[in-house]
Amino acid sequence: KREKGECLLCQSTVLADCEFLVPGKLVLTETTGQNPLHQSARLKGMQTVAPDVTVFQLELDKPIDFMAGQYLLLRLPGMEGYRPYSMTSFAANTRQASFVIKRSPGGRFSEALFAGGAAEHRVDVFGPMGLATFDPRENRDLVCLVGGSGIAGIMSILSQAVSLDYF
């Protein structure tokens, strides 16, 4: 799609003022049946599993339904802007979501987690978001290729697939 001037915004760095053209109305509920919502959550169970990787859970104020492979936008109090993180867990109508995060030098959210200042904090949450999901009704072979912390969303997909005895 590069030849059409398209790119993945999640993999881009803005270097100057820019303008985005969205051809038509984007309605997430048309493809997922979900409405992302704002809410708060409590960060808990933080555990460093490697020098630059931590896992933690969020206890959401309200239950959410999300599709395996989706993500939530997270923001610590006083932080400007949200950061997207894929859930590693999968459960329907849940108040619990699990994450694995790699330290990103200069990353406000990840640096706060690794500095230890975020433990047991409240977190602003928006979501669920994303269309890189698993739908077992498609009944197709499932091939997952990932690396690094990109494994998070795939862990959610594999969790659902295993729970359904998909393989």
Predicted regions and their residues:
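Conserved strand-loop elements at the edges of beta-sheets that form or border functional pockets
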Residues: 12, 89, 136
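Short, surface-exposed secondary-structure boundary micro-motifs
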Residues: 23-25, 77, 128
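FNR/FR-type flavoprotein reductase catalytic core
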Residues: 94-95, 101-167
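Glycine-centered loop/turn positions within well-structured domains
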Residues: 8, 16, 64, 130, ...
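Long, contiguous hydrophobic alpha-helical segments, chiefly transmembrane helices and signal peptides
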Residues: 1, 7-8, 71, 85, ...
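Iron-sulfur (Fe-S) cluster-binding segments and ferredoxin-like electron-carrier domains
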Residues: 1-26
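Ferredoxin-reductase
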Residues: 31-122, 140
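Anionic-ligand-binding alpha/beta catalytic cores of soluble enzymes and soluble regulatory domains
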Residues: 23-35, 160-164
